[in-house]
Amino acid sequence: MRGVGLRALSPEEEQAFESQFSTIWEGMMALERKPEWEGIISRLRSDVCFPLISSHIPVGIKRILISSHPPTPAKLKSLAWSNTTDAGVFTWWTEVGGKQESGEKTVYVYVGSASNHPGGLIFRKRYMLSRSAEPHDEALKRKIKDLGLSPKGQFGTLFTVPFENSFEGDVLDVRAFSILTRLLLMIWLGAVGGELKSKTKDLVPWKLGKIQYIGLATDNPLLTDINKSDEPKRSGKGRVKEGTKGRVKRRV
């Protein structure tokens, strides 16, 4: 999947992708959420969001999602990384640290989003497990430690969207779409754990017993502050006021 040209989805494949997208999206709308998400979600129906999100998901990722079986750990490990300042959704996989006596190591997968401007995916990768990580990343760091996982995992990209020239230049919309797409894809891949897993298991297109990896994400993104930066605390940047419109100038 690295740098290989892929043919477009057939009409049948596109229909299958849209159908599963709609099913998961409707299920997402039933999840608990903070009040500030109400106004955003009220105008983001599935038929409105589908073309916007679909156009930013690579064909190769779509084929993984509409497959009759979940991706193998090897397939997840092959996902390419986009070293970009665009917003996006990514995977981070890891295994138990050290040697394992027998058999293949269990793969653990975290699906996260990068929605801070400026910075995007490249900054998210740099700071996710840093000492100055945000609270939701601190929870991930604790889980890595408790499970004895290696912190030296590998990143792959599922979705990218530019902060500029997207959604009429509204940075808040880019941020919201990135967070919503993260929730969509972590459910779709069955890469969730904790209470959220029991709430979303019926939305996963494959039998959970067929999935050969363990999801590390346990948070419901709709309970996060849409205005809160995912940039490290020491930067003091990244907070976006709701209702902010217009083109965002790049910093130089």
Task: Annotate each language-model stretch with its function.
Residues 1-108, 113-252:
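Boundary/linker segments flanking structured domains
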